[in-house]
């Protein structure tokens, strides 16, 4: 697992990642008692906001150094060092959430299968991964998928 992240530098230079996530959290709309998995939780700021809504949230990240401040600052939350390509849980989650993390993992198919396996039937996946180059890939995939359904998205 990668461990090249610096939590101090991340907090100083990339706080916008969690500060601008209000709309994404609104889409997630966490409810009291829901089981929610936060994939690529980093230092845990958004995971904590999900927990504040009353959800039972588990934060996972592949970087032990990023999880250190999460565990220190939010000890009431369950934190796991895990690879997003290989998520295995005994019970499914009501929702999987991810903000600004998945674009760092080149094995998108493995991540998608892993996320799908973590969700209960009818569960929801709410994510933002608009890193450099991703948006064009997503647009092209949507155009192809639309064309297969007879919908012109160009």
Mark where each language-model region is.
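Conserved class I S-adenosyl-L-methionine
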Residues: 1-34, 45-49, 66-69, 73, 124-151
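Short alpha-helical
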Residues: 19, 45, 65, 103-106, ...
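Class I SAM-dependent methyltransferase SAM/SAH-binding core
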Residues: 35-39, 43-87
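A short acidic, Gly/Pro-enriched loop at the edge of an enzyme's catalytic core
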Residues: 85-96
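A short SAM/SAH-binding and catalytic strip from SAM-dependent methyltransferases
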Residues: 95-108
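A short glycine-rich, Lys/Arg-flanked "PGG" loop and its adjoining helix->strand segment in the class I
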Residues: 109-124
């Amino acid at each position: 697992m990668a461990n090249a992240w610096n939590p101090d530098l991340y907090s100083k230079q990339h706080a916008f990642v969690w500060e601008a996530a209000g709309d994404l959290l609104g889409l997630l709309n966490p409810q009291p008692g829901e089981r929610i998995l936060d994939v690529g939780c980093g230092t845990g700021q958004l995971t904590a906001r999900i927990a504040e809504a009353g959800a039972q949230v588990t934060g996972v990240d592949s970087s032990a150094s990023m999880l250190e401040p999460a565990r220190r600052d939010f000890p009431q939350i369950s934190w796991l060092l895990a690879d997003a390509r290989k998520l295995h849980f005994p019970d499914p989650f009501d929702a999987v959430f991810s903000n600004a993390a998945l674009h760092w993992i080149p094995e998108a198919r493995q991540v998608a299968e892993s996320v799908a396996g973590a969700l209960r039937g009818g569960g929801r996946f709410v994510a933002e991964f608009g890193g450099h180059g991703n948006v064009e890939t997503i647009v092209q995939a949507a155009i192809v998928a639309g064309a297969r359904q007879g919908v012109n998205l160009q």
